């Protein structure tokens, strides 16, 4: 019996060492050497401090900023740990809302968001990504159309010409990955940083 167990145990130890130790360390080392910024989380620094990541969205609510997609992430309720409260872009709780297309709660949330956006920009169709959450709840990007939809509000709040803001959006559009994958997109954090830089000039 020991003769049968020995090869199995040797194989278990060898595969554990290779797949659990050697492979992860090799991949981490190669990623750190070839892509140091990405391996560290694609962090964005401003004035010597980290202000975010280009991979994780943030909750921008000010009138003078571009807003991202709605986020369905939540956190434990401080008053009652058995319940949760909304916590937009909570990276520790990445997930969609799990609300199906027949959910009354989802319909109410979308109706409320839609009404607010239509009041902000009457007569213009609302881009779908401004009322729908992503699968992760942490999407850092919006469509160019969603960014352009917000231009009039930001122009009013910052007293800037709309044409200048449209040019700003156009300069931040990232195309499809490898020309094939995904859709054109705008990173909301990067766009807001460029917007702040514009205001300083």
UniProtKB/Swiss-Prot annotation:
Residue ranges of the TM segments: 10-30
Location of this chain's protein in the cell: Cell inner membrane
A Pfam family matched in the record: KdpC
Keyword Metal-binding on entry: no
Membrane protein topology class: Single-pass membrane protein
Cellular component GO terms, alphabetical: plasma membrane
Sorted UniProt keywords: ATP-binding, Cell inner membrane, Cell membrane, Ion transport, Membrane, Nucleotide-binding, Potassium, Potassium transport, Transmembrane, Transmembrane helix, Transport
Principal localisation: membrane
GO molecular function per UniProt: ATP binding; P-type potassium transmembrane transporter activity
UniProt-listed HAMAP family: KdpC
Subunit structure, as described in the record: The system is composed of three essential subunits: KdpA, KdpB and KdpC.
Family according to the record: Belongs to the KdpC family.
Function: Part of the high-affinity ATP-driven potassium transport (or Kdp) system, which catalyzes the hydrolysis of ATP coupled with the electrogenic transport of potassium into the cytoplasm. This subunit acts as a catalytic chaperone that increases the ATP-binding affinity of the ATP-hydrolyzing subunit KdpB by the formation of a transient KdpB/KdpC/ATP ternary complex.
UniProt-listed NCBIfam families: kdpC (TIGR00681), PRK00315.1 (NF001454), PRK13999.1 (NF010603)
Protein name: Potassium-transporting ATPase KdpC subunit
Native source species: Methylorubrum extorquens (strain PA1) (Methylobacterium extorquens)
Organism placement in taxonomy: Bacteria, Pseudomonadati, Pseudomonadota, Alphaproteobacteria, Hyphomicrobiales
């Amino acid at each position: 019996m020991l003769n049968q167990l020995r090869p199995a145990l040797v194989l278990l130890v060898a595969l554990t060492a290779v797949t659990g130790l050697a492979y992860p360390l090799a991949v981490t080392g190669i990623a750190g050497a070839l892509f140091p910024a990405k391996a560290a989380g694609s962090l964005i620094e401003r004035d010597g401090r980290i202000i975010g990541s280009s991979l994780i969205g943030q909750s921008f609510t000010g009138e003078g900023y571009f807003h991202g997609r709605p986020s369905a992430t939540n956190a434990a309720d401080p008053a009652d740990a058995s319940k949760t409260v909304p916590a937009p872009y909570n990276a520790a709780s990445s997930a969609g809302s799990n609300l199906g297309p027949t959910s009354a709660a989802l319909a109410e949330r979308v109706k409320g968001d839609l009404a607010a956006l239509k009041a902000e920009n009457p007569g213009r169709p609302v881009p779908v990504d401004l009322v729908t959450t992503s699968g992760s709840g942490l999407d850092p990007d919006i469509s160019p159309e969603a960014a352009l939809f917000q231009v009039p509000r930001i122009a009013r709040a910052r007293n800037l010409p709309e044409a200048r803001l449209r040019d700003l959006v156009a300069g931040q559009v990232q195309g499809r990955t490898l020309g094939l994958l995904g859709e054109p997109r705008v990173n909301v954090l990067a766009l807001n940083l460029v917007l702040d830089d514009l205001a300083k000039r």
